[in-house]
Amino acid sequence: LIGLVGSEMCIRDRSKLGILSSTAMQRGSVPYTGLSGQFTYYANRLFSFLRPSPLGKNLFVKLNGAVYSGGPNPTFGASGLAAVWAEENTRESIFNAFSRKEVFATSGPRIRLRFFAGYNFDESMLTSVNGIENAYSHGVSMGGTLLKNKSEGESDTPTFLITASADPENAPLQRLQVIKGWVDKNGNTKEFVYDVACANNLEVNVETHRCPDNGARVDIESCAINPETGSAQLATLWTDPTFNPQERSFYYARVLENPTCRWSTWDAIRAGIQPRPDLSKTIQERAWSSPIHYVGQ
């Protein structure tokens, strides 16, 4: 009877899940230390033929004499966030927002991003207390489909309204972007990235469609940033300079923060060593909207 009870307890325990995080060495951001690092590296090379996966041969890498965990994990970013524009905080309202695709994603920060398209937008919507309400009334939001304008006397070219607010606990915003994808007359898929609003009242270059450098820098020794660069909010109205009303296309918004230290750099600083040389030392956290599709018919 005692053995039976013990067996049942083991079965129940095995069905439960636990969650833990790896150490900096296991994440691959700092090297293994001492003889354990050398043993791990050469043992992995010696027995790599036992692993059928190509990734098995790269589980550990040697850089400047130091042994790091390899594989794809060190190149990954940290966890992101899913954001929903729902009318209220209820299961039904949130589900409806998912159904109409009025959702966006971030790489981790709590950035707020709005994206609309329509034919009757004007500059007053950027500052009016009813601006977002008017955008819903006269256009479509992220995740929606914009049809060709058939109203006589109005422009065939849609206007896009984009607003973003920074996470107050993170870096300021650097730029707003719109990414356009389309299929040309020959059936080829195309894509182009437009900078549409720049921090610190800088102007987008009309030829390159890029914001100038706003001077944001990161001190790799301490991960300190210069908070006087960047903006807490960015907002603009934008029209596609190459818009073709006959082409099917999609547009989505993206907002980038000023550069900050990547998680692997933070690990290295806390360990009192230099960051791993083959990984990016900084990252620009960001948010992406769901796309708005244009149907030219």
Label the model's feature ranges.
Residues D13-A43:
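Divalent metal-dependent hydrolysis catalytic cores, especially in the metallo-beta-lactamase
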